[in-house]
Amino acid sequence: MTHKELNELLCDMSLEEKIGQLVQVPGSCYEEGAVITGGMNNGWREETCRLAGSTLGIYGAEKLKKIQDDYLKTQPHKIPLMFMLDVIHGHKTVFPCPLAQGATFSPETSEKCAEAAAKETGASGVQVTFAPMADLVRDSRWGRVMESTGEDPYLNGKMAAAMVKGFQGEDVGEKGKIASCIKHVAAYGGAVAGLDYQNAELSEHTLREFYLPAYKAAVDAGCEMAMTSFNLLNGVPSSGNKWLMRDVLRGEWGFDGVLISDWAAVGEMVAHGYCEDNTEAAVKAIETGVDIEMCTPAYADHLETLVKEGKVSEKLIDEAVMRVLMLKNKLGLFENPYKDADEQLEREIQLCDAHRSLARQAVRESIVLLKNDSTDSDAGKKLLPINTADGMKIAFVGPYVEGQDMRSSWSVSGDEKDNVTLKTAAQEIFGGAALAEGLEEKQPGVLLRFAEGCTLLDNHTIVNLGQYDEDNWEEINASLLSEAEECAKWADVVVLALGEHRFQTGEATSRTQIELPHIQLELLRRVASVNKSIVTVLFNGRPLDLREVSKYSKAVVEAWMPGTEGGHGIMDVLTGEYNPSGKLPMSFPYNVGQLPMCYNHYSSGRPKPEGSRGDYNCRYLDAPNEPLYPFGYGLSYTSFEIGSVNLSSDSVTSGEKITASVTVKNTGKSKGSELIQLYIRDVAASRVRPIKELKGFKHIELMPGEEKKVSFDIDEELLSFFRADGSFGSEPGKFKVWIADSSLTEGDAAELTLRD
């Protein structure tokens, strides 16, 4: 439709019909047996469901086409229903969780994953995804860190923009594309004490420097929607924050898409104490510019009366409705209300070979090798990759050896039965089928045994959506631990597969203790008492306290929540088929008491002296200041040497750029890929700058003995920041420049001067 036709449509709509376009109801309102009336059984008025402009949480081409047909029969102007779904890291093919994708440092890979997810989702009849999440995260007590790409605004911005492009392409109306929704605006990840839904208290400077840039990157990439966050931001709920939504999001950034609240966030402004009732919440939300209210009836129940009483301008309603209509028009729904819904394509494309292959590659790239010590028998040989010579005995032990549910939270449409387990992948690689009792398999050259080791959880553990209780928990684990010890005694190498339950991460999963379950640590200790050659593979959605894991393991592999192709991707790395190149997108703390933490913090007036305890300075008495594993860290099966930084000029002025470069050499014995990272520090400024900031990264692949030059451009824009007066720009002065393999790598920095 043309803009003129959309205006004519808007003018012809009744007020009730307009308000309906601003209401989103749960998909259960339209499920089987509900004549567009199922809302009556779900607390929603029949008329609200009949006129609602969008719904969420349901998928399936045949089902959604029927719902659309039934819906359109009741529509005065035949405006199609819009279907939305949480497609966070895949639909039926589940890719690694976003935090794992952050570890790839590959926007290109994330773009491909989003593109594949869009194709699968579109074929299922869904037109909008509530992704990507660009919340900056510094506190792994907060469960939704798994949905972010990490603690760095530069990395998050690159990843968010790539995902938007993958979902939407150049034209969201094209086949195989869906609209994306950047969330959660803003600073949902800044919750006090990592407690979900809690207030975020952040200065405007901190917001603009760290928390807002990734959202803006998604807006600049053309995201069609944005979502308000649940939380208070400096005492004001995001769904009622005019400064944030109208001044910044729409005014400064030029966002002209649809703004939707998170689930019930408009109504929750009453619980926050910001509004007396839903009537006031409706007023504040529409004045803030919230176009669609998700799953609470403040708009449906009160907006019509508020307009008629003159308490809300109908102009505000019209502006919001027009944005909704424009999105439906961009999606092509007026011409084809089903968009890409296609039962045959749905069967063909979901979990297709191409998508599984992409998922496997994404798993490979996301894996971070945290530790790899030498074997006891050969000080010159690392434990990984696993030796698969004749007669080698490998034991796979732990709850994730056969545990299929590696999907992570927010993989709502994936199915654990489609996931490749570690055991399945190991059997495929080494051949043969399991014996009747599943204990031992003889292969040409390799012997395998498998043991569950222990239960995944301690008894009476609370997870999201429930609590784990087992009457015979102690007896079960006594037997499993004994079996694991026997397995470990027999083996040359033990692959220990440990981790969190998928519902220990995600929404509403804040934790004050971030170690592995106690029973898993007991398994680790028991195995270590009989076999020191332990490779621990971790399945988790947040940085954990890994002190014990690191202590008892010769090798530690961070596999995150890897999704559908987890087993294949992990085995590719363990066997050396793929040389790990992932890097941590979030610091792993030494212990929970360090949280929140980040690499790009500010310097103290009393910094802790290098290599000494020091007195009356910025330090902990009982722990190091540094994380156990820092941001940007990750090992390889080969080794790399990074030379000194060379600047093409030691000064730069406005309008100019210089080049910072290093020579990187593969000094090991195998081909490998290294992530070369550019960090910059502003030495002195009107507002103190972080000790180090990521400003660029590049992957480089080298053969043994090969060396290449890696270069980064540096210009005034890269050196700019939010100054003391609140403006964004640069200041003349000195800068330090590092090019390294992690944020903690120390060495001589090159010095650069920015001149007027």
Regions found by a protein language model. Name each.
Residues 1-723, 729-745, 752-756:
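Glycoside hydrolase catalytic-domain context in secreted enzymes
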